[in-house]
Structure formats: C-alpha cells, structure tokens
Amino acid sequence: LTIPGEGSVSAMSWTDVTATNFYFDTKDYPGLVGVSFEANMRLANGNGYGYVRLFDVTNGIAVTGSENNTNSQSSVWTKSQEVYFWAGKNLIRVQAKSLTADTTVYSQGRLRIVTEN
C-alpha cells in the first residue's frame, strides 16, 4: 500500500509531514499476518539521526512498531518492526523529527502487508 505525500521536517519533536494522510482498517485485509512500514528517507546534513513514524490521528497515538531512522545523507529505504494498528477505520499520517536541528527528508513510504491468502 503506497502512502501519499512527501516532505521535510527540521524539528526535534514529532511533526506532521504534509499531505501524508491515509485510512487504514485491518478488516480490509482478511487473513492479515503482519504489516511493516517502509520509508524512503535521508538526513539532509547527516548530523545525528532522522526519524519517521506513523501516527494514528483517530486515536491520538503513535502506531506501535512504526518508527524508522537513518543517519544517511543519501536517500535509503528503511523498514520498521512489525506495526500494530488499532481496530477500526483509522486516519493515519506520517510524522518526522531529528535529534538535532538537521532536516529529516521523507521522500515516500509504503506499508508491506502480509496475508495468509
């Protein structure tokens, strides 16, 4: 599942990445075995680490297991641990931050969804 949007964040606290909203409902995937979040990202100056995660706007929580990070100045694909969504049709968006004042650049993302079927 491709996640829309891209953007950059120069903040040390979690900040929404513009236009990355999408809806996700586990019921839409019968036989769901697991989900991971893959993000193409980089850290503009390689100063510290850049982070991205998924945020469940509907329930006001970070999506468990969804955090990715890199210290690369070149765009790289990163992969989260297994991601756990709350039940129901939830509005999800990408958030980003860095541990320094460097800029985290999020280029694209996707959910890798594994089902039994």
Placement of each model-derived feature along the sequence:
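Extracellular jelly-roll beta-sandwich "head" domains, especially the C-terminal globular C1q domain
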Residues: L1-N117
